[in-house]
């Protein structure tokens, strides 16, 4: 069982709400730090191990700086994420730039910042050389194993159907071209799963990359210096799910590392992950208030939050656990659809969910909203994105992003010539 708790009491929460009205996202600073330390320590056996935080998960400079202090880098996929890194002070090889269908302006910024370029497309070698004039001495190449790897979901897709990465044949050709053009340092990357809780599946991804590195060494004489295993380490969204044990995962990867890489003379390959979801996801909460009850063919609880605050349930049908503050131990003897006010019928945080009796004014907490929550927010239907708060170990709170206003919403419109 995966007990779902909150890092504040009802009294603490009411004090926070007195200053910052609902809805808002709040992140548990201590939880993020301790979880990240645990992950990094699990892989301490690998001398060059690096975790790059997937900025897209929670693109907030406070979160990024928090992780930077732990030695965590940044996995960027867009110009905006690169600019965030620049403002935080994350540069050089502390950035892995993993993008696709990439405009040159984004490559240009990544190269100016000294980021490692993770090539998604073999044609981008020529594209970069033509537009930039020269290539850096370090490259990573994204591998799409196709039918060799099962899995995928609506986010990543089945490998053979996904738009990402290169085939095995293209990987070898890309390495030949890059070496001929003077590139000296090579890496492999793959990302074929998302929100994976099965450790065997995660280790299988590592084995896939390790075998590829061995084949590259044998066939091309090129030594792969680093292997980025992507993200994909999952979050146990449901109470009955078991979170990934970092120690068990690390042991599985280490066994494969020794069996495949070390056994073939590749003793010093640095490993990396670019996790985002598991870093902040379990330590973020969407705090809302029940403002309406409606009884027709079903029983509805209307919140002051909507899918503009958390899109995952509507977009993916994802489960997010719900706690009603002060009623944690009350019997779950009511069945509700928990909704927002968007003019879309899929604006539902829960469908036919067994919950305690909810009254108007109750504080409703939506769990595991720390990744791909606020960052996937939007303004459709004129909705405003909510504030982000950081809860410190001593119980104090820092607002790390203010709530949007209607002035923000209309700021790009020109009313002067109406």
Residue ranges and their predicted role:
Residues 145-291:
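Active-site loop/helix belt of alpha/beta enzymes
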């Amino acid at each position: 069982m995966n007990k779902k708790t909150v890092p504040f009491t009802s009294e603490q929460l009411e004090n926070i709400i007195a200053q910052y009205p609902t809805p808002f996202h709040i992140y548990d600073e201590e939880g993020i730090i301790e979880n990240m330390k645990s992950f990094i320590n699990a892989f301490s056996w690998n001398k060059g191990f690096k975790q790059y935080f997937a900025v897209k998960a929670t693109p907030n400079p406070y979160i990024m700086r928090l992780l930077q202090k732990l030695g965590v880098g940044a996995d960027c996929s867009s110009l905006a994420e690169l600019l965030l890194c620049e403002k935080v002070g994350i540069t050089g090889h502390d950035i892995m730039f993993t993008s696709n269908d990439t405009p040159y302006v984004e490559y240009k910024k990544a190269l100016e910042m000294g980021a490692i370029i993770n090539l998604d497309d073999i044609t981008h070698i020529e594209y970069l050389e033509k537009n930039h004039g020269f290539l850096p001495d370090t490259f990573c190449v994204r591998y799409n194993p196709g039918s060799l790897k099962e899995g995928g979901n609506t986010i990543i897709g089945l490998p053979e159907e996904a738009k990402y990465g290169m085939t095995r044949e293209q990987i070898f050709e890309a390495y030949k071209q890059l070496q001929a053009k003077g590139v000296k340092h090579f890496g492999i990357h793959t990302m074929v799963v998302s929100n994976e809780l099965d450790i065997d599946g995660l280790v299988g991804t590592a084995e896939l990359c390790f075998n590829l590195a061995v084949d590259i060494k044998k066939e091309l004489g090129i030594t792969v210096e680093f292997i980025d295993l992507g993200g994909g380490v999952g979050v146990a969204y449901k109470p009955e799910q078991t979170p990934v044990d970092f120690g068990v995962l690390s042991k599985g990867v280490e066994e494969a590392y020794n069996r495949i890489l070390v056994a073939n003379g590749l003793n010093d390959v640095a490993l990396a992950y670019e996790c985002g979801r598991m870093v902040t996801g379990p330590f973020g909460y969407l705090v809302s208030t029940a403002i309406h009850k409606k009884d027709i063919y079903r029983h509805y609880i209307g919140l002051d939050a909507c899918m503009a605050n958390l899109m995952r349930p509507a977009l993916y049908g994802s489960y997010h656990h719900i706690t009603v503050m002060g009623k944690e131990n009350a019997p779950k003897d009511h069945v509700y659809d928990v909704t927002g006010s968007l003019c879309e019928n899929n604006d539902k945080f829960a469908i036919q969910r067994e919950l305690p009796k909810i009254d108007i004014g109750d504080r409703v907490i939506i769990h595991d909203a720390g990744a791909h929550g606020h960052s996937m927010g939007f303004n459709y239907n004129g909705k405003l994105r909510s504030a982000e708060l950081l809860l410190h170990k001593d119980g104090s709170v820092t607002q790390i992003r203010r709530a949007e206003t209607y002035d923000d919403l209309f700021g790009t419109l020109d009313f002067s010539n109406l």
